[in-house]
């Protein structure tokens, strides 16, 4: 331990102790909060089913930074490089299109065996896995509908894909000893004025009921559903709206996924967490950064990221909220994108854990809003960075921006060779 870091750490402990915070306990709590990193940042959501195909479903990865992963081996190697630079517990979130097979596999026929390499890798790296059916970038999603499709056979194809995905998810949980959260997001919607908004939602309701009809061990698998305001090509109507999925998750007692970019730009998911928790058993968060729309920019340590983390910590939602990331920026080094976004999420959680919440609650209950605001603002300038640096050191990861040197070296040695 360097003398400088040790001195800063001791001073930070004293400063936080003065406001009633045990920093060692905060670090122990931080180690209870894994962040699920999303595999698709590494290859711009290409996957391995048809990596040269177009990305559809109203989502878009912009940029052409060299060195993106071209196969599962490269993607896993890139993930390992990123994870070495991120302290604390992590998980990996996979989409169905990241299967591995020597022969083509129809999406309604995916099986656990197509993901066994991911499971073995996760075991070796002490990671949990999460999962998603991939209801986009496919000929049978080309007209903008999947689980709500009016064609019975097409709708059944997507139902069967989601059913198969649940079995893969349960396999992850059984093999790794930690439940896999499987999130269903569909792009279904219409570009222009929609006359019948009810029928697609009726079909989606029935389809989802069929999807989750097979009983799976909740110790292995958790169902989640995700809403969206709009997507490219579905600006006027989205079948799976917030109201639809809030009602579905409440009535079926599934987890509800809140994506930071899936609402109107003036809405924030941090304000939705406490409301949703009154009705649903668990939440899945997709922490992202929307810039004017669901642009999926890299997560910053900004006000909303901090507010999300604070809601989790203030209400002791450690066992009911699953933290995932969802962004994909192809204009910068993809490994750096993972590192920046994930470290920022963890920094926000640490800052939340260092807040004197009990004292702030007392002030709020007493109506002393002056002191509440003063304390909240003074808290921002306390030396949380020294606590973060100690946390990084204990996890053998870089404490500051020196991680970028490792990324640059990897880029020169590995990424530059990919063409």
Swiss-Prot record:
GO molecular function: L-rhamnose isomerase activity; manganese ion binding
Highest rank taxon of the organism: Bacteria
UniProt key word Disulfide bond: no
UniProt subcellular location: Cytoplasm
Catalytic reaction equation(s): L-rhamnopyranose = L-rhamnulose
Binding site for Mn(2+): 262, 294, 296
GO CC, any one term: cytoplasm
Annotated InterPro entries: L-rhamnose_isomerase (IPR050337), Rhamnose_isomerase (IPR009308), Xyl_isomerase-like_sf (IPR036237)
EC number: 5.3.1.14
Pathway of action: Carbohydrate degradation; L-rhamnose degradation; glycerone phosphate from L-rhamnose: step 1/3
Keyword set, alphabetical order: Cytoplasm, Isomerase, Manganese, Metal-binding, Rhamnose metabolism
Presence of keyword Manganese: yes
Cofactor(s) the protein needs: Mn(2+)
Catalytic class of the enzyme: isomerase
GO biological process: L-lyxose metabolic process; rhamnose catabolic process
CC cofactor note: Binds 1 Mn(2+) ion per subunit.
Record-linked Pfam families: RhaA (PF06134)
Family recorded in the similarity comment: Belongs to the rhamnose isomerase family.
Binding partners and assembly: Homotetramer.
Function: Catalyzes the interconversion of L-rhamnose and L-rhamnulose.
Protein name: L-rhamnose isomerase
